[in-house]
């Protein structure tokens, strides 16, 4: 579709939240590094997950698809040193997780991708390559990274405020090296929730890492991943769209969510409650957010950057002023998300000012409607769809198919809840 045309309406009903993309990436990787057969169930085959599957297959994992399950055997992982090409598509997780994994043994690998992926930072790895004499070459702006060599265990100093994905990539890799290792975090660590997901998944697959208060991680070498069966839980970063719609007056029951989850994006519940919405636990793994008298607040984007676009929609329709702070990393996602959500919501009638590392949002009673652009970013497209539920006139979203990156069934689910739309 080139565009979707949405007639404003409240959403109502129950929706099965897609499985967590973050946890699926991690489970596929750990299973692929295990010597034996694992079954990973409840998989949503988004573009990012397919990229990780294909990447691990390129490195030697045997992966079979059976409906929503993956049967994975890592017996032959990294057995040969033949030249390999790994297409990351637009998945930053695939790229940053698999780069160090590909260097567990001597290897030659070409990482390619598309979209904005070539513009996303990789300097953390380049510094490690130079220290360890791993050969590498890359093209500015485009993702065409060639690496040759292998990693050795030891001490790794990593900034914590660029992307937690670098740390996760090393956490997956270092237990399989001969030497013991230490990761030292040299700045304040952002997105701790994603590190928790990585550590939890690694532990489930039988690997031990000591976490010293997120300042350093101590990793014994010569460990091995153990195969297991694992079901992926529902994704709070996707539930955040429906929670936000609920806060704005829709009535949506979200299924397949674990309230004890380690997912950092679960923070959306606390933020929305702080703004005046109310959480309802309907039954086991079933949650709703109910509309309340919404007021502006301060939202720290450093620990939950992925849910900031849709929370900006809620803030735009809340009383008073909301400030998004510590959000500079949103500029290096699939698009510049601070600029994109500010620009597009203002087209719909919001009052948002863009800052270097955040936003100032002055609430309005309602949005008007109009034509907006997704910036080919899945989270911007879905956020604008939620904004349409509080518009007076129809909303036209250009380039809506980008939702396939993380949530291929979004538009069907939106319609099943009473959303009125047509694609062109």
Swiss-Prot record:
One of its GO terms (cellular component) is cytoplasm. One of its GO terms (biological process) is aromatic amino acid family biosynthetic process. Its EC number is 2.5.1.19. The keyword Amino-acid biosynthesis applies. Phosphoenolpyruvate binds at residues 21, 92, 120, 165, 337, 379, 405. The active site is at 306 (proton acceptor). One of its GO terms (molecular function) is 3-phosphoshikimate 1-carboxyvinyltransferase activity. It catalyses: 3-phosphoshikimate + phosphoenolpyruvate = 5-O-(1-carboxyvinyl)-3-phosphoshikimate + phosphate. Its main location: cytoplasm. It comes from the Bacteria. Pathway: Metabolic intermediate biosynthesis; chorismate biosynthesis; chorismate from D-erythrose 4-phosphate and phosphoenolpyruvate: step 6/7. It is found in: Cytoplasm. InterPro entries: Enolpyruvate_Tfrase_dom, Enolpyruvate_Tfrase_sf, EPSP_synthase, EPSP_synthase_CS, RNA3'P_cycl/enolpyr_Trfase_a/b. Keywords: Amino-acid biosynthesis, Aromatic amino acid biosynthesis, Cytoplasm, Transferase. Pfam families: EPSP_synthase (PF00275). 3-phosphoshikimate binds at residues 21-22, 26, 163-165, 191, 306, 333. It is an enzyme of class 2 (transferase). The keyword Transferase applies. HAMAP family: EPSP_synth. Belongs to the EPSP synthase family. Catalyzes the transfer of the enolpyruvyl moiety of phosphoenolpyruvate (PEP) to the 5-hydroxyl of shikimate-3-phosphate (S3P) to produce enolpyruvyl shikimate-3-phosphate and inorganic phosphate. Monomer. This is 3-phosphoshikimate 1-carboxyvinyltransferase. It comes from Clostridium perfringens (strain ATCC 13124 / DSM 756 / JCM 1290 / NCIMB 6125 / NCTC 8237 / Type A).
């Amino acid at each position: 579709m080139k565009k979707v045309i949405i007639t404003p309406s409240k959403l109502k009903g129950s929706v099965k939240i897609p499985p967590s993309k973050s946890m699926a990436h991690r489970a596929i990787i750990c299973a692929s590094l295990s010597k034996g057969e694992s079954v990973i169930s409840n998989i949503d085959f988004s573009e990012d997950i397919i990229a990780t599957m294909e990447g691990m297959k390129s490195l030697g994992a045997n992966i079979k698809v059976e409906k929503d399950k993956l049967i994975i055997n890592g017996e032959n992982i990294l057995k040969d040193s033949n030249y390999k090409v790994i297409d990351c598509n637009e998945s930053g997780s695939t790229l940053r997780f698999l780069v160090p994994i590909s260097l567990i043994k001597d290897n030659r690998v070409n990482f390619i991708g598309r979209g904005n992926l070539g513009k996303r930072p990789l300097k953390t790895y380049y510094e490690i390559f130079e220290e360890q004499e791993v050969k590498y070459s890359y093209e500015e702006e485009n993702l065409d990274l060639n690496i040759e060599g292998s990693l050795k265990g030891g001490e790794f100093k990593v900034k914590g405020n660029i992307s937690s994905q670098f740390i996760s990539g090393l956490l997956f890799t270092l237990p399989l090296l001969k030497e013991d290792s230490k990761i030292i975090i040299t700045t304040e660590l952002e997105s701790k929730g994603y590190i928790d997901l990585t550590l939890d998944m690694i532990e489930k697959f039988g690997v031990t890492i000591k976490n010293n208060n997120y300042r350093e991680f101590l990793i014994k070498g010569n460990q091995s991943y153990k195969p297991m069966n694992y079901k992926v839980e529902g994704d709070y970063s996707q539930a955040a769209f429906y929670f936000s719609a609920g806060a704005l007056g829709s009535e949506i029951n979200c299924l397949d969510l674990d309230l004890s989850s380690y997912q950092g994006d679960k923070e959306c519940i606390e933020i929305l409650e702080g703004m005046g919405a109310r959480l309802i636990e309907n039954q086991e793994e079933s949650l709703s957010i109910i509309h309340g008298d919404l007021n502006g607040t301060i939202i720290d984007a450093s620990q939950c950057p992925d849910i900031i676009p849709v929370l900006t929609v809620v803030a735009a329709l809340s009383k008073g002023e909301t400030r998004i702070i510590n959000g500079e990393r949103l500029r290096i996602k699939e698009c510049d998300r601070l600029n994109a959500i500010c620009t597009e919501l203002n087209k719909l009638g919001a009052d948002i000012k863009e800052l270097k590392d955040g936003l100032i949002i002055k609430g309005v009673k309602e949005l008007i409607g109009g034509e907006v652009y997704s910036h080919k970013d899945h989270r911007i497209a879905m956020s604008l769809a939620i904004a349409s539920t509080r518009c007076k006139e129809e909303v036209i979203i250009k380039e809506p198919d980008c939702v396939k990156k993380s949530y291929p069934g979004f538009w069907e689910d939106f319609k099943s809840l009473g959303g009125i739309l047509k694609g062109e």
